[in-house]
Amino acid sequence: MADTAITVDGAEKRYGDKKALDGLDLRVARGTVHGVLGPNGAGKTTLVRVLSTLLRPDAGRIEVSGHDVVREAYAVRLRIGLLGQHAALDEELGGRQNLELFGRLHHLGARRARARADELLERFDLADTGRKTVRQYSGGMRRRLDLAASLITEPEVLFLDEPTTGLDPRGRAEVWDSVRSLVGGGTTVLLTTQYLEEADQLADRISVVDAGRVIAEGTADELKAETGGDRIDVVLREAGQLGAAVALLPLTGVTVDTDRRLLSAPVTDRMEALSGVVRALQEAGIEAEDVALRRPTLDEVFLHLTGDDRRVKEAA
């Protein structure tokens, strides 16, 4: 389909007895950011390697920009860029020299490679540092330069495999801004990440992957709705009163975080739940430091969908 940049039907990949991809299905619309979330070992990096033709699938129909990744691997490579988890830069060279080198490796002529390097340095706000060696760059600057290198050939589809791992908040924000500008220019981005905030900030749609399969897909708001919509959080003054509060509050599905003296539960009628909780606590003489309504976070969605909630326990 003309409006679909990536099509995956029934992708399978084995490593010995382990299925890294187990019948995975995926659709990514052209000109969007599609986030792929999942715990370690879920199959995210294997998926990126298959889509970028670095790894041959065992089964399935997989197309990128209308080309089959097995039968038309070369055509796929001409249309994609890849930013892996580890930087592919020469620290002894300057930023401009690195980009020129990537250009020559992609068979650009010397003049075109220099021009493209200058374009990308300007685009990623690195023009003033182009002569500095990469060793002198901050983490965020290195990652932006690495991202620029992946765009030397002006790809239709860009794969970002955990692009901000190890960066501080400032560095992550710099990369996020760069990704937003790419999509504004029409590039399709497939983003794998372990930062839930990153997917919430960048992704138009999100696929949650576990055990080699997509177990949920939608916008961030759609996925958050799957955990029960709105939630109410109650922070008590005394942790010792958590059990009593759970027993008397007019709520179901309550979770308890003892360290934070926090009770949390899904609600359907926001105002009725809020007034009911405040009234019940007052009548029982239980002091609350804070009572608030909120939407569920993407972290809670992730833990709920993957069954990996180790931080909170269902109240008995």
Swiss-Prot record:
SUPFAM superfamilies according to UniProt: P-loop containing nucleoside triphosphate hydrolases
**Main enzyme class:** translocase
A GO CC annotation recorded here is: plasma membrane
- What PROSITE patterns has UniProt attached to this entry? ABC_TRANSPORTER_1, ABC_TRANSPORTER_2
Q: What compartments host this protein? A: Cell membrane
Q: Which sites bind ATP?
A: G38, P39, N40, G41, A42, G43, K44, T45
The protein's GO terms of the molecular function aspect are:
ATP binding; ATP hydrolysis activity
Q: Name one Pfam family in it.
A: ABC_tran
- Top-level taxon: Bacteria
Q: Does the keyword Transcription apply?
A: no
Keyword Hydrolase set for record: no
For this chain, the family text in UniProt reads: Belongs to the ABC transporter superfamily. Drug exporter-1 (DrugE1) (TC 3.A.1.105) family.
Extract the NCBIfam families matched here: drrA
Q: What is this protein called?
A: Daunorubicin resistance ATP-binding protein DrrA3
| Annotated organism of origin | Streptomyces coeruleorubidus
